[in-house]
UniProtKB/Swiss-Prot annotation:
The organism of origin for this protein: Rhodopseudomonas palustris (strain BisB18)
Record has Aminoacyl-tRNA synthetase as a keyword: no
GO biological process, one term: maturation of SSU-rRNA
Main location (coarse class): cytoplasm
Gene: rbfA
A Pfam family of this chain: RBFA
Domain of life: Bacteria
Name recorded for this polypeptide: Ribosome-binding factor A
Family, similarity comment: Belongs to the RbfA family.
């Protein structure tokens, strides 16, 4: 009897998850950028949508967002959560899927993490270590 091997998946999921996530990301970003959600908080912020991660069954989409400038993240998350039913319906109309995915909104903290690493790399102690490493090679 042959053994079934699971395919190794990339950190973001299968090709299908990545493809559907990108389609959902585009739909949400377009909706937010064109003022499709009539909410004063959301209309007052430019919101980027750098990534959407889909569950393996494609029924759950984790939407990573970041208000431009990184301000008012809690307020923006609350406004997105309050408008989730409308956003989900609007995305379902734009995306041809068997099920409209449930949306979870999260703040994308990669920018903050990258900035923290940049600051760390510029500290005198790290600069000294990097200089010593380059002198040895």
């Amino acid at each position: 009897m042959p053994k079934h091997h699971q395919k190794a998946q990339s950190p973001g999921g299968s090709q299908r998850q990545l493809r559907v996530g990108e389609i959902v990301r585009h739909a949400v970003a377009e909706l937010l950028s064109q003022g499709g959600v009539h909410d004063p908080v959301l209309e007052g912020h430019l919101i980027t949508v750098p990534e959407v991660r889909m569950s393996p069954d494609l029924k759950l989409a984790t939407v990573y967002v970041m208000p431009l400038g990184g301000r008012d993240t809690d307020v923006v998350l609350k406004a997105l959560a309050a408008n989730k039913p409308f956003i989900r319906t609007a995305v379902a109309r734009r995306v041809n899927l068997k099920f409209a995915p449930d949306l979870r909104f999260r703040i994308d903290e990669r920018f903050d993490e990258a900035e923290r690493i940049e600051k760390l790399l510029r500290t005198p102690g790290v600069q000294k270590d990097l200089q010593q490493d380059s002198d040895e090679t």
